A protein has these predicted regions:
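Glycan-recognition and catalytic cores of secretory/periplasmic carbohydrate-active enzymes
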Residues: 1-129
């Protein structure tokens, strides 16, 4: 199948976000730092891969790499490329909730363990608990 052996930028970015989220959720649930060491290693591995292969110059990420991490003629860039890069870059610096844009607007950058000061957006289904 064409492209199945490619390494795509968005997949690596999602891996960064997933490792950060699992680590933080486990710590919030009472896990010890030694319990989440594996996720810290995964996070560092993803970030090292991004720096070594995906960032071609400041502000420029390669979208697709071949099986040997060589640049593949990129498809047309889209806003999703930026979305994934921003999410991966900020994941470690923001809390799990609220989502990225609301967390930034509430001043939660570099305060990942702090909940949002207002809880109005925490229950977006309108349920009261």
């Amino acid at each position: 199948m064409p492209g199945e052996d490619e390494h795509q930028q968005w997949v690596v970015c999602e891996g960064v976000c997933a490792t950060v989220a699992v680590r933080r959720a486990m710590l919030d649930d009472g896990a010890r730092v030694s319990d989440v060491e594996h996720f810290e290693h995964c996070y560092r591995s993803f970030v090292d891969y991004i720096h070594d292969y995906l960032i071609s110059q400041p502000g420029r990420w390669l979208r697709r790499l071949g099986p040997r991490n060589e640049n593949v003629q990129p498809a047309k860039s889209s806003r999703w490329d930026v979305y994934h890069a921003v999410q991966a870059t900020l994941a470690i610096r923001l809390p799990l909730w609220p989502p990225t844009a609301p967390a930034l607007s509430r001043g939660l950058l570099d305060r990942p363990e702090e909940p949002a000061p207002d809880k109005k957006s925490w229950n977006f289904f309108g349920l009261r608990g």
